[in-house]
Amino acid sequence: MRADLRVRDGLRACADLLKRQSGRIAYAGNSVTAQRASYRVPLHERLVNRFGQAHAAVGAGLGATGAMGTLFTLPELVLRHAPQLCFVECSVGDIGTRPPEQSIGPVVEGIVRRLGAAGTAVCLLHLYRDDSAMGDANPVVRAYERVADHYGIPSIDIGATLARAFDRQQMAKTDLLMDGIHTTAAGAGVVADLIAGALDEIFDAPPRAATAMPPPLHADHFEFCSLLRPSPALVRDPGRCHDGRFRLVYPYLAIEADNAVVLRTGADSIVGLLLVTGPHCGDLALAVDGGVTEYRTWDRWCEGELLRTVVFREPVRPQATMTLEVLDRCTRDDRGTPPLDGGRRLLKLAALMKHTRRGGAGDDGEQRA
């Protein structure tokens, strides 16, 4: 079985480099990339064997944060390692988290431009989930592919390949997938084989003449962005917040219910936030210019703690005052409000996501407010 792929400009120059010397290959994506039984482990073994070099694997998978979470953690999880090649697997996450459709292309373009500026080759991966159309029938995939077309980036569509195989009963879904999304050990091997087979064609494609990075496809692309780490000074009642660390590593500020973050945006817009979800999480109310929008942070994956994103339906404009209130309730679509073992609900805020329309000092890193 052959994976659906678009070679475009291919990766011949990258393949030649990986063959000549040892380097790093990054795997940026969402939970299917991060999970223990992930395609990335057998795929990396196949790539090391192909090139005959002991390339280091850079794992940069998060939970279902979509492209937005990958973009804003790119400096910390990928760029500082200076990989020669980066696989980007975020479309399945975007299908699940449902960010505003108009934001997907600009965010994916931000990932591509930041990797390209660092000299890192890119290949897009579309994986499978059973609760949505796959391939070009899905608007999320189409948004990714428009960016790939513009920049000549290869893409491999495992989602469309497996959907067709399942429909034709060539493979049993339960053999490859634990829950309709995440792979079993056998499924990880199948996905890795399909990707490796597609890469044979992508790596061997005749090289095209080197060209400069093309002008942006989207006027509001996200090449210039950074994380704004919260501090108690941003909180309305600083006495009801405390520092914590997600899995003992990733810092956050825990803010109790009926408290709020209050921020003047300055010259940049705030497009969302990076937070730790789990049994503690509650609804959020964002107030800007007298209007209030509520966001639900709970979903079916919140039985344990996960690093996730909330993407605002409309960015908070520059020179605005935003108030982000943590409500002492939690709405979920399927089974009502989940139980909470004592205490009040919390927002475990890792960072606010800041978008700068033009490059400037600090655009590649993070700040603390």
Residue ranges and their predicted role:
Residues M1-G63, T73-Q84, L263-G266, G272-A287, ...:
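Serine-esterase "nucleophile elbow" of acetyl-processing enzymes
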Residues E89, G93, E109-E145:
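Active-site segments of SGNH/GDSL-like serine hydrolases
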Residues Q21-A26, Y151-P154, K173-H221:
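Histidine-centered active-site loop/cap adjacent to the catalytic His
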Residues D204-T265, L274-V276, R335-A369:
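Glycan-recognition and processing domains
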Residues P279-R357:
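Beta-strand-rich ligand-recognition modules
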Residues R36, D94-I104, S132-A137:
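Extracytoplasmic/secreted cell-surface and envelope-processing proteins
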Residues D4-G10, C123-L127, P139-L176, G189-F203:
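Extracellular serine-dependent O-acyl
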Residues L5, Y27, S31-V32, G59-T70, ...:
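Cell-envelope and extracellular/periplasmic
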